[in-house]
Amino acid sequence: MAASNPPKGSVSSSSIRPVTRKAVRCQREVAWLVTQAAGRLVASTEDVNAPTPSFVLAAALDSVRQLELAEQDASGHLDYQNVMAPDLQTFCHMAKLPAAPNALSDAGYMFTLSGADLIRDIYAYCSELAERHVFNAAEIKPGYAIKLVLRLFLMDGFGTMPA
């Protein structure tokens, strides 16, 4: 008996590959935050190669998750609203970062997430934030979560995290 071939145009489970690149719309501020976070990563390791934005975000997300666990263990919580509330110039002062260029605006920036794991982790983090009602929103957009993760990472790195 001959093996049956699937109909032309059908998709088999072996032909489905995970998405490995995803463009996410963010504020232009995110581009600047990534450069600051990359500088912090390079300064804290002996690797002199410039990390990719996706690598920086993955490291920042890992750091933020550890920070959240530590806060839970201490029966505390992170003050997400105070991390996101200030404008960029005020945030830079709070996080002890150099002043951001004045040319930065709320104009768009496309952040390309690379890697199926990072894409899945960012979307899972969005869901977690929404489930915990962190911002009293039914849905947290990936661009907002990326900005939050980078801000938390940069504030924690200099011991300036609001309680």
Positions of predicted regions on the chain:
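Short, basic amphipathic alpha-helical segments that act as recognition/interaction helices
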Residues: 44-78, 134-163
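Serine/threonine-rich low-complexity intrinsically disordered regions
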Residues: 12, 20, 27-29, 44-47, ...
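Short Lys/Arg-rich basic patches
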Residues: 2-41, 84-126
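Mixed-charge, glycine-accented linear interaction segment located at domain edges/termini
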Residues: 122-126, 130, 147, 151
